[in-house]
Regions:
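Beta-strand elements of repeat-based all-beta scaffolds
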Residues: 20-394
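Bacterial Sec-dependent N-terminal signal peptides
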Residues: 1-24
Length: 394
């Protein structure tokens, strides 16, 4: 008798799963349950063509045993080379599947009878499959307002020339003429409003220059690398070719590296440099900015880690060798709740009844307060590692 009930239930589920889908099409039905009784859910059906490409996606509203929701569908079209061309905006459909031709004829009604409720991509005639035009959804964008992309090489003309910057062995910045014609790949992009921009890349794919046109005026942002490929300078338009020390300190982004290619000094426009110190495991252990360096007793921000390279402590010290004069700003606890009942974790709301679900996760934290009163936090998780509760001291 029990086996008979199981078979009947299985048959009912099969019939329900196939309901309202087109059985002549390949599809995957996904249901997201909203209640534990499995009677209320969201349905998503993705239909595939004979080549296994998704061409129609149908999303239904909340369904239950008493009513059916409205279906919203999108359509994806491909060209003869299998490339995505037209992506249709979601449209209301009845029934839950429409053949592509029927979908295209009915979709405008969902978008104010706009004749082109889809985005479109146009490709160049080459095996590289690069997009040369992109149209936004709507007839207005299709009437001469695409995002157009052209591919070319650099040259001596004003808009296609690129200054060659290099970093010396001492870390200084030098300009050494222009790149030879045809040695860089240039992408020219024209947006829907006719504004042009250029991106210059070298043969290994690094961006060297981004040029945005403001009418006839070029606004250039240069990216300069050292011989190891590390980004050392970012020169915004305000530099305008003047790479004097004063101008670089005022406008440029500057980075210095050690022999392990770790950034040990960073300088942002108009600020003092920030210094970084690492341990033998390449973990950041100390940092110091200009404000800390200007103090009579120079402060450093220190960082401590556990054996799994997780940050356990962060604060200030006055000596980066002995970490003397320590002021703790952040203290992190992981894996267990053994800290409950110690220090600031003494309130009745800090529970230890966690069933061991904190393994591998941040379970507690102390954050120093501005007024000197730290905030104590505990994080609780379920069996799947999802945070289900957070307790903070007041």
């Amino acid at each position: 008798m029990n086996m008979k009930r199981i078979y009947l239930l299985y048959l009912l589920l099969l019939l329900q799963a196939g309901h309202a889908q087109d059985s002549s099409q390949n599809y995957i039905l996904t249901r997201t349950m909203l209640k534990s009784d499995t009677k209320s859910y969201l349905s998503k059906v993705v239909y595939y063509d004979g080549l296994g490409r998704p061409f129609q996606t149908v999303n239904k509203a909340i369904e239950n045993t008493n009513k059916k929701g409205v279906s919203l569908a999108t359509l994806q079209e491909y060209d003869a080379a299998g490339r995505e061309t037209k992506t249709w905006l979601p449209a209301v459909i009845t029934p839950d599947y429409l053949a592509p031709a029927s979908f295209k004829s009915s979709a405008p009604a969902s978008h104010g009878n706009d004749s082109r409720p889809y985005q479109e991509a146009v490709y160049e005639t080459s095996p590289q499959n690069r997009i040369v035009k992109q149209y936004g959804a709507g007839a207005d964008w299709h009437s001469g307002h695409p995002v157009a992309t052209e591919f070319m090489g650099n040259s001596a003309t004003a808009q296609l020339r690129c200054t060659r910057y290099k970093v010396t062995s001492a870390g200084a910045l030098e300009a050494s003429g222009d790149y030879a014609n045809g040695t860089l790949n240039v992408t020219r992009t024209t947006d829907e409003d006719g504004n042009m921009s250029y991106t210059f890349m070298d043969k290994i794919g690094r961006t060297l220059l981004e040029r945005r046109m403001n009418g006839s005026e070029a606004l250039d942002t240069y990216y300069v690398y050292d011989n190891y490929g590390n980004l050392c300078y970012v020169l915004p338009p305000a530099i305008n070719g003047n790479i004097s020390t004063d101008n670089l300190n005022l406008y440029a982004y500057q980075y210095n590296y050690d022999g392990c290619n770790r950034c040990i000094r960073k300088k942002l426009p108009g600020t003092q440099y920030i210094e970084y110190v690492y341990d033998n495991s390449d973990r950041l252990t100390f940092s110091q900015d200009g404000s800390q360096r200007a103090l009579s007793a120079q402060n450093w921000t220190y960082y401590k880690y556990d054996q799994l390279n997780r940050l356990t402590e962060q604060g200030l010290c006055t000596n980066k060798v002995t970490t003397s004069g320590t002021t703790v700003h952040i203290m992190n606890y992981y894996d267990s709740y053994s800290f409950i009942g110690t220090q600031g974790f003494t309130g009745s709301n800090f529970s230890t009844d966690t069933s061991g679900y904190g393994k591998g996760a941040l379970t507690g934290q102390m954050v120093a307060g501005i007024n000197g009163n730290p905030v104590w936090k505990a994080f609780y998780y379920d069996i799947r590692g999802r945070e289900v509760k957070r307790v903070e001291s007041n």
